[in-house]
């Protein structure tokens, strides 16, 4: 149906002058940047619609000026020639030139009420606007499907495409189809690299005028969107929408694979890469791939050696914000991770996980030596043997099982030592960090602390002695201090 309407020429003759508005130089200066951008977009869209429905006429001078990026204003004495530039004009030239200084004000009246409120004395009644309003009131073109009426036939044609879901405008480069010619025009700029909308503040260019308007909010200090719950302000409406989901707990973006929900669509996209294994962000230095751009940025700090996050109290620097946050908890004494079994709190989540092994009653045991551990068997096996832990009670005759990993060898940039995986490299880097800390802190010898012989004897008695039980397991025994006089 829509395709037939596009091919059929409407009965009512429409010219570009019916849908165009002209400005003088004085009137053009009254427009702000948003109004100028909107004016350019509307004029180009009107022209493209007339061409798409089959109206054949030469390109108006106004359209040529807009396409070249020139200022579209004209002189007062050129208003009459501009009115005659388009053939088939149904509005008489006499009517157009009778009030030459009112052309631009008609658009201002329709597009920006705020500017009228700021400058009400600048505008007078416009007979052309009254004529256009009378035509809008007479909506002769009715949509039979939804009952919506239009004052112009090509608006009805454009509207019917929505019901038919047809996409008559196809990109010749990639074959993508669109319902509107303006959408096709904006899409083709992706292939051509054309970015006609430039920011006057920083020079950044955009393919769409709407993106330019959104970008210009950054330069302005206005933050019009306010959260009613906490009073936090935002520059963009979608940022406020994402923020309000924190208060409501709403997570509308759900993963179809595992059912996990997120408050932001970008977080869902990054999460889905876990299931697909996709890692589109690649480091140019070492070739390592990452699922998210934030992970890549954090990784690139290693190559540059940057530590942008600094503690203001002690001056210690960190690569990531999480490392600085954990460090600052030490100063503040915060321990947000609490054990649900005994109520003990920890400053790091990893320490909570290690602590919870005690409540689980699982005593992990080395399979070859029989050495018992409760917390750090996993670290012990990875550091020494590259093995996975096994719970006590399992057969000790099993051969050591290496960790299956596809990670590339990791090289320490400070000493050149090579490690099998990133975990071993991280543990090795702590040695260098400890060395740096020791250089900064004064060293106190044990002899200066234990000058009293009685304290020294108690210290030596508390040192563990190594014994072996019947099963061959290594056991550490602490010597008890004698309470009475020693026997002869």
From Swiss-Prot:
GO cellular-component term (any): nucleus
Record GO terms (molecular function): DNA binding; zinc ion binding
InterPro entries, per the entry: KRAB (IPR001909), KRAB_dom_sf (IPR036051), Znf_C2H2_sf (IPR036236), Znf_C2H2_type (IPR013087)
Pfam family, one: KRAB
Disruption phenotype: Mutants are viable, fertile and do not demonstrate any gross abnormalities. Males have lower body weight than their wild type counterparts beginning from 6 months of age with a slight decrease in fasting blood glucose. Male mutants have altered body composition and elevated fasting blood glucose on a high fat diet.
Biological process (GO), any one: regulation of DNA-templated transcription
Family: Belongs to the krueppel C2H2-type zinc-finger protein family.
Protein known as: Zinc finger protein 92
Source organism of the structure: Mus musculus (Mouse)
Lineage: Eukaryota, Metazoa, Chordata, Craniata, Vertebrata
């Amino acid at each position: 149906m829509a395709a037939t309407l596009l091919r059929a020429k409407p009965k009512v003759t429409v010219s570009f002058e019916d849908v165009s508005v002209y400005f003088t130089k004085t009137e053009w200066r009254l427009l702000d940047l948003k109004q100028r951008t909107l004016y350019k977009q509307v004029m180009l869209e009107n022209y493209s619609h007339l061409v798409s429905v089959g109206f054949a006429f030469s390109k108006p001078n106004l359209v040529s000026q807009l396409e070249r990026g020139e200022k579209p204003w004209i002189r007062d004495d050129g208003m009459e020639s501009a009115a005659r530039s388009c053939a088939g004009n149904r509005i008489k030239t006499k009517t157009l030139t009778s009030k030459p200084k009112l052309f631009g004000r008609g658009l201002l009246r329709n597009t920006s009420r705020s500017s009228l409120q700021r400058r009400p004395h600048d505008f007078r009644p416009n007979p052309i606007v009254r004529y256009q309003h009378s035509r809008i009131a007479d909506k002769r073109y009715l949509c039979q499907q939804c009952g919506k009426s239009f004052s112009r036939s090509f608006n009805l044609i454009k509207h019917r495409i929505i019901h038919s879901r047809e996409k008559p405008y196809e990109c010749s480069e990639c074959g993508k189809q669109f319902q509107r010619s303006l959408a096709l025009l904006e899409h083709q700029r992706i292939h051509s690299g054309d970015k006609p909308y430039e920011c006057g503040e920083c020079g950044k260019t955009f393919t769409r005028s709407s993106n330019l308007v959104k970008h210009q909010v950054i330069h302005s200090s206005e933050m019009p969107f306010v959260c009613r719950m906490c009073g936090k302000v935002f520059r963009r409406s979608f940022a406020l929408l994402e923020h309000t989901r924190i208060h409501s707990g709403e997570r509308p973006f759900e993963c179809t694979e595992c059912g996990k929900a997120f408050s932001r669509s970008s977080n869902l996209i990054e999460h889905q890469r876990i299931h697909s294994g996709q890692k589109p962000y690649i480091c140019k230095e070492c070739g390592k791939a990452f699922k998210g751009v934030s992970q890549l940025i954090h990784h690139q700090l290693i190559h540059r050696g940057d530590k942008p996050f600094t503690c203001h109290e002690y001056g210690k620097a960190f690569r990531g914000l999480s490392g600085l946050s954990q460090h600052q908890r030490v100063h503040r004494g915060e321990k947000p991770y609490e054990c649900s079994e005994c109520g003990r709190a920890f400053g790091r989540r990893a320490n909570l996980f290690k602590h919870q092994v005690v409540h689980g009653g699982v005593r992990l045991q080395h399979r070859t030596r029989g050495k018992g551990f409760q917390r750090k068997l996993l670290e012990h096996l990875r550091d020494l043997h590259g093995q996975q832990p096994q719970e006590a009670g399992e057969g000790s005759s099993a051969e050591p099982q290496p960790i299956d990993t596809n990670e590339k060898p990791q090289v320490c940039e400070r000493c050149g030592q090579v490690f099998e995986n990133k975990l071993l490299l991280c543990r090795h880097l702590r040695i260098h960090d400890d060395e740096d800390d020791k250089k900064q802190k004064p060293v106190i010898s044990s002899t200066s602390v234990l000058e009293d012989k009685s304290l020294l004897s108690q210290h030596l008695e508390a040192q563990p002695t190594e014994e072996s039980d019947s099963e061959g397991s290594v056991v550490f025994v602490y010597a008890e201090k004698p309470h009475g006089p020693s026997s002869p």
